[in-house]
């Protein structure tokens, strides 16, 4: 028996060896996974269930079944042919146990019978799907389970894993040992003992581990746990493991590692899902043996400790399944990311082909940017097409209205759109939200200054069936037709003929019926004066009733009224807000389209043909004339109040009518502003006049609903439109509307806004009516005024008026106007005082421009985009500082220099050389006031820098927006630099210099003076008034250089001679010197020319006295003091000479 068993074992080992050469661990693992995936596929395979139970101590039970016999036979063959007694075999019922946690596990468990299938003798076992058994509880049966702890590790850190697996232990004597319920320990010897662990195919969901004794008796394993802990010195015991396919609920798989890290593995639930052979590492060889009967045996090294561990110290928790490795997760993530990237790249390529074509080459960000730009372009095109479609639908609706078809569609229908379309497209026509947090249900652009409008709130929109016919209004052609018919009816009234026929019939009541002739006679009537007055009174009464009815029809019932919170009102406010946004952005074409849509919704569409324009213009002229008659207004108001049933209804309807008139007036006013400023394609003059009259008429009808400032703006805009469009033909109408606007300001101009206060001044009115200004030219950037609103004609005219005041102030300094008559020269106004008066007015008008106002405020229509004009204020301060320095007012120079020193950002950005020249000239004037020694040197340095910038400004070519203002500013700057250099030279000469003596200047001073004089000569070629300064400063440079005094005296004589305006050619008067130039020339001649050049000593004194009077009248205190000192010196010398 022993030899046969040994031979059988060797054959089995040879078969396992041959099978191991053909199969690998991966193949076996793949087969096991395949079988594990088939769980639940065949539920009827193990439908046979046995219900017999057995006691836990190894007591006998019922007789075994055929499956038990085959199982015993298989075991005997596996043991080398040892026979077993079939009567001793036991049969067990196959009952799965429910899964329980270690904390709730008890030592006693339910008993179950295992159906053991024999292992056929084949090289490769055939894998078949196993059904999942049905659980049947066995409350009486109890058994215990035994656990073997295997301690391999996978990582460097010690880890503990517990695996519970059913094992059948077979000793060397080919007999099975019964594992007892108590705690046991496996101790290895110094020699490696082969241990064979045979695992049978288990197909029960929850099964117990059975062992077979030497006599073939199978016993259940108790739930005792055997723990093996690897000591520091561990010996490997090769264990033969027969891998079988086991389907249970859970399994924790572990492998062995070569290091000695203790890993505790246990299976709390004996129901195993699969069992695979341990993975083979680099240092661990797992040989696989195949027996003769096809049994696969695998040796697995097991590290076993030498000490017993109590069961209480065994950890009861069961670790979860080991998560997938980091490398596997990373690989899966990379695959998914690669798919995502591929999909995104494909879509970007497709987007590039759609937007730029297949041949274009561009990176991904460029493709997305181009796509976004193209989408925005499509949105804009779609918006414009939608607007055009809306206008066409409204025009079609207007034609239907004229034909008497679908009269109620303009009131409560959204421009011939269905209510469902309105609800679907409610967000398409609304302006974009200002930020992402704005609610989509309300308009983010509603304001408090205007009446609330339910732009997007359907709950506030009234679904009224139809408005009264009075809300529809009449078109202008119908109004004119009614007026013409009324005029013809009154001119050719049939009532007059009827009354005359009735009187003739009364006189012929008793005619003569006989034959013969009758004599004409006059019969006196008995009625008296009542007979002939009654028909006349009756005729006038009937005609008055007819005319009054026509007025009521035209001015009350014929006016379109839009009820609040209706579909038409919602549409109007949506386009109105969008127009305001377009105006703020500068998209004037889109703003005009939205305003035209607003007027169409209000029932006041713009005329599209010449006939419509003629009828509309005629009706507005008639209406404006009727509104000026107070009797007509009073009668209409009384009739309107009587027409309504109750006072509350009349007041509500009157308020709605005024609100509709106000909205229409503002829309007409804004369209008129866009037309006269040239922001829209050029239209006819009649169209501009028509819009102006519509705005004025409706604004007057709105009465208190429209603010007074807006009403004044509407009249001023109408005046500007008539002046620019009609010119001299209808200039009286422009003056009429200007006077009308001034009368609206009140007697003391209390209600006039600050931005319009300049028109109440006589200079402003004169500039408005007499000066030629253009508002259709594109708004150019100016060095002298800040940028105004390009769509506001009043702001542009105000800008032109400010520049005109600045030009007048500078011209009064460099080009004083002389009187025509020589006798008036003494009474000529001082040039300094005139300049200061202009600058004072300019400063007040600049401050009254007004601050920034809300763009959607109904009280301000297209206000200026800026507050006070800081640029014009800076120029005002600079010119005032120059006048103060010329007058010798040092305190005023210092006070104004603090304002000039803060140059505005807008002027710094321009990098204009003229601005820099003026700035450094002001710094030079301020430095010259310093009493220190370096003050004159600093002033000289600033003069040099200002001279360089002035020369550059003269060399700048190209058209400028204000050429005349540039010339006078350049002339003033050049004159200031030359005067400043002369003053510095005279200071260096000192008080020790006597009369007739000359102090020669240095070469650097002469070079700077000659450079500025060259700039003055160059400016004189294009600006003739500069010659008067040339004749004054050329003698000065000759005196500084010590040149021939004869030529110097001849040049001074040009400024000293008196001239009259008689017999002078045109343009020569501009070259005549003014009073200040003549006084300055007298000072130079009397101080620096030799005494021999004057004819007599008395002549010098007379000239100095005249110069002192002139300088005192001008206000030049510094030069006047110098003149008086010279008179004192000259008086002493004259007395000595006379004695």
From Swiss-Prot:
Phosphoserine modification sites?
A: 1096
Q: Which UniProt keywords apply?
A: Activator, Cholesterol metabolism, Chromosomal rearrangement, Cytoplasmic vesicle, DNA-binding, Endoplasmic reticulum, Golgi apparatus, Isopeptide bond, Lipid metabolism, Membrane, Nucleus, Phosphoprotein, Steroid metabolism, Sterol metabolism, Transcription, Transcription regulation, Transmembrane, Transmembrane helix, Ubl conjugation
Q: The bHLH domain covers which part of the protein?
A: 328-378
Known regulation of its activity is: Activation by cleavage is down-regulated upon activation of SIRT3-dependent PRKAA1/AMPK-alpha signaling cascade which leads to inhibition of ATP-consuming lipogenesis to restore cellular energy balance.
Q: Name one GO molecular function term.
A: RNA polymerase II cis-regulatory region sequence-specific DNA binding
Q: Supply the name of the protein.
A: Sterol regulatory element-binding protein 2
Compositional bias per record (Low complexity), positions renumbered to this chain: 61-77
Coiled coil region boundaries: none
Q: Where is the composition biased (Pro residues)?
A: 119-138
Q: Which parts of this chain are annotated as the region Leucine-zipper? A: 378-399
Q: Which family does it belong to?
A: Belongs to the SREBP family.
């Amino acid at each position: 028996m022993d030899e046969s068993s040994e031979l059988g074992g060797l054959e089995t080992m040879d078969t396992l060896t041959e099978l191991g050469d053909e199969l690998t661990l991966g193949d076996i693992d793949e087969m096991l996974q395949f079988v594990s995936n088939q769980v639940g596929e065949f539920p009827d395979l193990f439908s046979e269930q046995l219900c017999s139970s057995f006691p836990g101590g190894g007591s006998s039970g019922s007789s075994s079944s055929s499956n038990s016999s085959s199982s015993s036979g298989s075991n005997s063959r596996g043991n080398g042919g040892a026979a077993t007694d079939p009567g001793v075999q036991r049969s067990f019922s196959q009952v799965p146990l429910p899964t329980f946690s270690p904390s709730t596990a008890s030592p006693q468990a339910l008993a179950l019978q295992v159906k053991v299938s024999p292992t056929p003798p084949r090289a490769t076992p055939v894998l078949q799907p196993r059904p999942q058994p049905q659980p049947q509880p066995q409350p009486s049966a109890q058994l215990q389970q035994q656990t073997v702890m295997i301690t391999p590790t996978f990582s460097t850190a010690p880890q503990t894993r517990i695996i519970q697996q059913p094992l059948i232990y077979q000793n060397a004597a080919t007999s099975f040992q019964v594992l007892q319920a108590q705690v046991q320990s496996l101790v290895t010897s110094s020699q490696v003992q082969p241990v064979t662990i045979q695992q049978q195919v288990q197909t029960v969901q929850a099964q117990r581990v059975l062992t077979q004794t030497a006599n073939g008796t199978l016993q259940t394993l108790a739930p005792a746990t055997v723990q093996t802990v690897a000591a520091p010195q561990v010996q490997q015991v090769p264990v033969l493991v027969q891998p079988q396919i086991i389907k249970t609920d859970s399994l924790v798989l572990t492998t062995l590692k070569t290091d000695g890290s203790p890993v505790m593995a246990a299976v709390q639930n004996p129901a195993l899902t699969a069992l695979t052979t341990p993975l083979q590492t680099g240092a661990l060889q797992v040989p696989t043996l195949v027996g003769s009967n096809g049994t696969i045996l695998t040796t697995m090294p097991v590290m076993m400790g030498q000490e017993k561990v109590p069961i209480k110290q065994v950890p009861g928790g069961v670790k979860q399944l080991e998560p997938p490795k980091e490398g596997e997760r990373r690989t899966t993530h990379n695959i998914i990311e690669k798919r995502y990237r591929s999909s995104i790249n494909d879509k970007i390529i497709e987007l590039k082909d759609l937007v730029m074509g297949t041949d274009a080459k561009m990176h991904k960000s460029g493709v997305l940017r181009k796509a976004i730009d193209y989408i925005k372009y499509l949105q804009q095109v779609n918006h414009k097409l939608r607007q055009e479609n809306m206008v066409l639908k409204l025009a079609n609706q207007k034609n239907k209205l004229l034909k008497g078809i679908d009269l109620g569609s303009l009131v409560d229908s959204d421009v011939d759109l269905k209510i469902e379309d309105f609800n679907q497209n409610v967000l398409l026509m609304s302006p974009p939200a200002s930020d992402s947090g704005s609610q989509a249900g309300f308009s983010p652009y509603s304001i408090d200054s205007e009446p609330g409008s339910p732009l997007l709130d359907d709950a506030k929109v009234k679904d009224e069936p139809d408005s009264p016919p009075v809300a529809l209004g009449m078109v202008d052609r119908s109004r004119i037709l009614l007026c013409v018919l009324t005029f013809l009816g009154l001119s050719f009234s049939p009532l007059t003929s009827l009354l005359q026929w009735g009187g003739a019939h009364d006189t012929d009541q008793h005619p003569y019926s006989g034959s013969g002739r009758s004599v004409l006679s006059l019969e006196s009537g008995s009625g008296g004066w009542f007979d002939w007055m009654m028909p006349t009174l009756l005729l006038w009464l009937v005609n008055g009733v007819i005319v009054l009815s026509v007025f009521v029809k035209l001015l009350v019932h014929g006016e379109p009224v839009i009820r609040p919170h209706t579909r038409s009102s919602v549409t109007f406010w949506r386009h109105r807000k969008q127009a305001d946004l377009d105006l703020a952005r500068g998209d004037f074409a889109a703003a005009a389209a939205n305003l035209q849509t607003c007027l169409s919704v209000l029932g006041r569409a713009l005329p599209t043909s010449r006939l419509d324009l003629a009828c509309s213009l005629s009706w507005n002229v008639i209406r404006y004339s009727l509104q000026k008659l107070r009797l007509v207004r009073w009668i209409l108001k009384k009739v309107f109040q009587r027409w309504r049933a109750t006072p509350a209804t009349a007041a509500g309807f009157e308020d709605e009518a005024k609100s509709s008139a106000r909205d229409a007036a503002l829309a007409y006013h804004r369209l008129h502003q866009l037309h006269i400023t040239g922001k829209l394609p050029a239209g006819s003059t009649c169209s501009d006049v028509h819009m102006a009259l519509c705005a004025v008429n409706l604004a007057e009808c709105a009465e208190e609903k429209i603010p007074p400032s807006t009403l004044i703006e509407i009249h001023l805009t109408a005046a500007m439109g008539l002046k620019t469009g009609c010119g001299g033909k209808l200039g009286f109408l422009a003056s009429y509307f200007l006077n009308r606007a001034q009368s609206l300001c009140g007697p003391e101009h209390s209600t006039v806004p600050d931005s319009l206060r300049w028109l109440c001044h006589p200079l402003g009115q004169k500039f408005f009516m007499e000066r030629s200004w253009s508002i259709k030219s594109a708004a150019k950037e100016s060095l002298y005024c800040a940028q105004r609103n390009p769509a506001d004609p009043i702001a542009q005219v105000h800008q032109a008026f400010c520049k005109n005041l600045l030009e007048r102030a500078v011209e009064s300094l460099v080009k004083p106007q002389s009187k025509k008559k020589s006798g008036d020269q003494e009474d000529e106004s001082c040039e300094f005082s005139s300049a200061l008066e202009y600058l004072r007015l300019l400063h007040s008008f600049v401050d009254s421009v007004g601050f920034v106002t809300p763009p959607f405020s109904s009280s301000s229509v297209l206000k200026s985009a800026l507050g006070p004009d800081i640029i014009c204020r800076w120029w005002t301060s600079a010119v005032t500082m120059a006048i103060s320095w010329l007058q010798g007012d040092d305190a005023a120079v210092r006070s104004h220099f603090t304002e000039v020193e803060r140059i505005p950002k807008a002027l710094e950005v321009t990098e204009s050389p003229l601005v820099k020249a003026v700035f450094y000239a002001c710094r030079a004037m301020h430095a010259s006031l310093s009493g220190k020694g370096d003050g004159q040197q600093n002033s000289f340095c600033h003069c040099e820098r200002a001279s360089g910038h002035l020369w550059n400004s003269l060399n700048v070519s190209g058209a400028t927006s204000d050429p005349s203002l540039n010339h006078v500013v350049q002339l003033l700057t050049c004159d200031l630099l030359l005067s400043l250099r002369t003053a510095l030279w005279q200071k260096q000469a000192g008080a020790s210099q006597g009369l007739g003596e000359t102090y020669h200047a240095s070469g650097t001073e002469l070079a700077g003076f000659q450079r500025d004089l060259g700039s003055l000569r160059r400016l004189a070629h294009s600006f003739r008034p500069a010659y008067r300064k040339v004749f004054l400063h050329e003698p000065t440079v000759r005196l500084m250089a010590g040149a021939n005094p004869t030529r110097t005296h001849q040049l001074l004589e040009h400024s000293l001679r008196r001239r009259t305006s008689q017999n002078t050619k045109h343009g020569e008067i501009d070259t005549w010197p003014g009073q200040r130039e003549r006084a300055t020339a007298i000072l130079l001649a009397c101080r620096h020319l030799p005494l021999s050049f004057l004819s007599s000593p008395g002549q010098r004194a007379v000239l100095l006295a005249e110069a002192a009077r002139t300088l005192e009248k001008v206000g030049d205190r510094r030069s006047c003091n110098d003149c008086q000192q010279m008179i004192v010196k000259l008086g002493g010398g004259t007395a000595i000479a006379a004695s």
